[in-house]
Every structure is written in structure tokens, then in C-alpha cells.
Regions:
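Acyl-thioester-dependent acyl-group transfer interface
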Residues: 1-71, 79-106, 237-425
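Non-catalytic, low-complexity flexible loops and terminal extensions
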Residues: 1-16, 122-130, 134-214, 408-425
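A short, mixed-charge helix-start or loop-turn motif at secondary-structure junctions
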Residues: 34, 117, 193-195
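Acyl activation and transfer enzymes in specialized metabolism, enriched
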Residues: 40-56, 117-133, 204-240, 389-391, ...
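Short, charge-rich amphipathic segments
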Residues: 59-69, 144-169, 215-230, 330-346
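Histidine-centered acyl-transfer/condensation active-site motif
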Residues: 98-141, 151, 155-164, 382-398
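Short, well-ordered alpha-helical segments in soluble proteins
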Residues: 135, 139-143, 235, 296, ...
């Protein structure tokens, strides 16, 4: 009788950014994000499954389950294979279940759309996007193989296994002491009625990126600054009078690969907080843009990002904290997360311009991205001439979203809006 030898089990420690997610994961905040690619034609499930099978070989760290140790969480390699299925549950539903050994990502489809959902402890948006683009490469070149029989396009994410596995927080940690304490100022907190089953409400706006860039340039600023200011104004318009004493603070994730060399497929991001106090500043858009622009200039520097990275990494390098049991670390991280949340109103995440090999572009209509949310969030990305801005919110109310898109429409921007009203799950 032939016996097949199992691969040896491999263990990987969570990177610094990943450690906050497991103790703070629950039904109200699943810590899951989604990438969507809408194709020109209906998705073929069998070809998509083949593409996933090829892709996972190139990203072995994603073929892991999350385990609890005495002192730390860790990833354990698994023989489980991802199974492609038609979309069957609400967006960004739970992927990490403490008592289950399951993969931490999922590939689903619906009509012309392919969805990649990933648990944030596994990777950030940039890392997951490398996986997603590789998956799309295999899918498109297989489904339309007659179009590529003379020559295959280049795969534009060719990092080695070691580079994809890299813990870039550890690599770039300098040990620099950050003595100044970070004070959390209470921010305005958006309230609302949640759906009974914590279903995420997603509203997607598709528009011409050139129109938004032209608007931003009219105000002598960038697309991100312009849309951040617009989001703040949309929130301000719904603030109760008694709450206007608190600043509006938007948390903005930053891809650290832009500032520190890395092509890791894992987490390597930081966050900056952009604050605007309407009691001390005017509420017209020009004034908000000016204030937001100054905040970005002040916060988005290599020096500040390095200090923030060192401050967060210091915990795991602390000799005492290394021997503290995991259940105490979990309590500390939950407490820290609650304190941090008091200083944040909402989140805005700009993935930026998504590119693929020029030979693949004709088969793709658009990309989209959004996160699970404890509060309203914006996720946005562009592909070709199209910018997609997605609001994800745990609340039934949509007044902030309406304010935001209405202001863009009043500026002459043509917007196609859809919502996640289709019932799944």
C-alpha cells in the first residue's frame, strides 16, 4: 500500500499590524475586506477554480489557519484548499472563527464579478491585491487562451516566496525610543441603527476619475485630500448641534511600502489621523480642504511613519510582554482598541490606481474595494478612466452617503450608484 507523505507543518508569527485583529474580531466588526473585479463577461466557475489553485501555490502564506499559542497567535500551514463558490452570504462576513481551522480568505463570484475576501490579520490591501491580480491573470489567460496563444503577458507581481513572506515591520524596526505619549482626543462618533444581523450596507458610486482630478486641481490639491474634505463636510452636515464641539477625525491607512522597501504579501501599513475642528474653523469646503491639506502634510512624512511603526513594534520587543500570557495580551489589545476608537469618526482608504498588464485590461470593466465597518467607511480605487467610491456602513441610515454623492453631483460629476440590496445568505 502506497503512503503519501504529508508536508511538514510550518508556523509563522503574525506581523506587528496583524496582532490587533484576532482579539478585536466579532460579528459587528469582522476585520474582513473585499476586492471586487467586474469582468466584461459572466464568470466561469471551473476556470476560476483552476486559477485559484494556481495562485495559491505562489502565495503559500495564505494557505494557513490561525492558531492560539500560550503567548502569541500564529499561522499554521494547512492542506486545506480554497473552494470557489457563488456568492452566498453578505459582504465581509466572518472569516476567522477562534474554534475552527479554516482558511482566512475566500473567492466567490456573482454574474460578472469575482470577489476576494480576506481576513486582515493575513494581509493588507496591497498584499491581497497582488494575490488578486495574479488570480485574474491566470483566469483571463486561461478563459481566453486563444487570444494569448502567441505570447502570454507578463505577470506584474513576481516577488520571490521569501519576499512575499517577509515581516517588513520586523525588518524595518530600528528600536528607536519614542518617549512622547500619544494623546487620544475624543472625536465625534457617528451613531445609527444597526441591522438585526449586522449586515453591512454597501453603496457604490462609479464616476470618471478625470472629472474628480479636475475638481481636485481646481482647489489646488490632490484627489485624496479633496475627497477626504468632502467626506468631512458630508459628516458635519449630519452632526447634532450638541456634538459639534468634537472634531471630525478620519483614520487614513498608509501603504508603508511607498516609504520603506518591501514587496511583502502580508501586512505592511500604518494609519494617520486627519482631524478638523469645526468649532475653530469655517465649514465651507475651501477652508476644510486647506485644513485637511495641512494635516496630510504634517502627518504623512517618513519620520512620523517610522516613529509610529517603532512605537507599535516596541510592544512585541518588550522582554516583559513576551512572557505575558496571551489572554492578558488580548485584554490589553482590546482595551487599546477601545481607547483608539474614541478618537476616530470614520475611515477613508484609497487603494489608488490599479493596473494590470495591458493585454488583460480589455477583459475588465472595473475594480472595487471596501472593509467591514464599525462606523461608516470609504474605500476607493481607480482602474482605467473609472473611479469607484464605496461606502460601507453598519447602519441603516444613508444620509452621509447621500450628502457626499450629492455634493459631487452638484459639481457636475456624473455618478452611477448601486447598493448591496441583493439578498444573499
Amino acid at each position: 500500500m502506497l503512503m503519501t507523505r504529508k508536508k511538514p507543518v510550518q508556523w509563522t508569527r503574525l506581523d506587528n499590524a496583524a496582532k490587533i485583529f484576532p482579539p478585536n474580531t466579532n460579528e459587528k466588526d469582522t476585520k474582513v475586506f473585499r476586492f471586487v473585479c467586474e469582468l466584461k463577461e459572466e464568470v466561469d466557475r471551473e476556470i476560476l477554480q483552476e486559477a485559484v489553485n494556481k495562485t495559491i501555490i505562489l502565495f503559500p502564506v495564505y494557505r494557513s489557519v490561525l492558531r492560539k499559542g500560550v503567548f502569541w497567535y500564529y499561522f499554521e500551514s494547512t492542506e486545506l484548499m480554497p473552494e470557489v463558490v457563488e456568492e452566498y452570504k453578505p459582504p465581509c462576513s466572518m472569516l476567522y472563527h477562534p474554534n475552527r481551522r479554516n482558511l482566512l480568505f475566500e473567492v466567490t463570484y456573482y454574474r460578472k464579478r469575482i470577489n476576494l475576501e480576506m481576513y486582515h490579520a493575513l494581509a493588507d490591501g496591497t498584499g491581497a491585491l497582488g494575490f488578486f491580480k495574479t488570480l485574474l491573470y491566470f483566469y483571463i489567460t486561461s478563459k481566453y487562451k486563444e487570444d494569448f496563444k502567441e505570447q502570454l503577458p507578463n505577470l506584474d507581481y513576481d516577488a520571490s516566496f521569501a519576499q512575499k513572506m517577509d515581516d517588513s515591520f520586523l525588518k524595518h524596526y530600528t528600536g528607536e525610543k519614542c518617549l512622547n505619549k500619544v494623546k487620544v482626543t475624543r472625536a465625534y462618533r457617528i451613531a445609527g441603527r444597526r441591522s438585526i444581523d449586522n449586515r453591512l450596507k454597501v453603496i457604490e458610486g462609479v464616476m470618471d476619475v478625470k472629472e474628480i482630478l479636475a475638481l481636485a486641481h481646481r482647489y489646488n490639491t490632490t484627489l485624496t485630500v479633496y475627497l477626504t474634505a468632502l467626506f468631512m463636510k458630508a459628516i458635519y452636515q449630519e452632526m447634532p448641534a450638541r456634538a459639534k464641539k468634537y472634531p471630525v477625525v478620519l483614520s487614513v491607512p498608509v501603504n508603508l511600502r511607498i516609504y520603506f522597501p518591501s514587496v511583502t504579501a502580508r501586512n505592511f501599513f500604518g494609519t494617520i489621523n486627519i482631524s478638523y475642528d469645526f468649532t475653530k474653523n469655517k465649514d465651507d469646503l475651501d477652508s476644510i480642504i486647506k485644513g485637511v491639506k495641512e494635516e496630510f502634510a504634517r502627518e504623512l512624512t517618513e519620520e512620523k511613519l517610522r516613529k509610529h511603526m517603532n512605537r507599535l513594534s516596541a510592544l512585541e520587543h518588550n522582554a516583559f510582554m513576551r512572557i505575558v500570557p496571551l489572554f492578558i495580551k488580548d485584554w490589553v489589545l482590546r482595551f487599546a482598541n477601545r481607547i483608539n476608537d474614541k478618537g476616530i469618526t470614520a475611515t477613508l482608504s484609497n487603494i489608488g490606481k490599479i493596473t494590470v498588464a495591458k493585454e488583460l485590461a480589455p477583459y475588465i470593466t472595473l475594480f472595487n474595494c471596501f472593509n467591514s465597518a464599525r462606523r461608516p467607511q470609504i474605500g476607493m480605487c481607480s482602474f482605467g478612466d473609472q473611479l469607484v467610491i464605496s461606502f460601507a456602513s453598519p447602519f441603516d441610515g444613508t444620509d452621509i452617503q447621500k450628502n457626499f454623492f450629492r455634493m459631487l453631483s452638484q459639481e457636475g460629476v456624473a455618478i452611477t450608484i448601486t447598493s448591496s440590496s441583493r439578498e444573499v445568505g
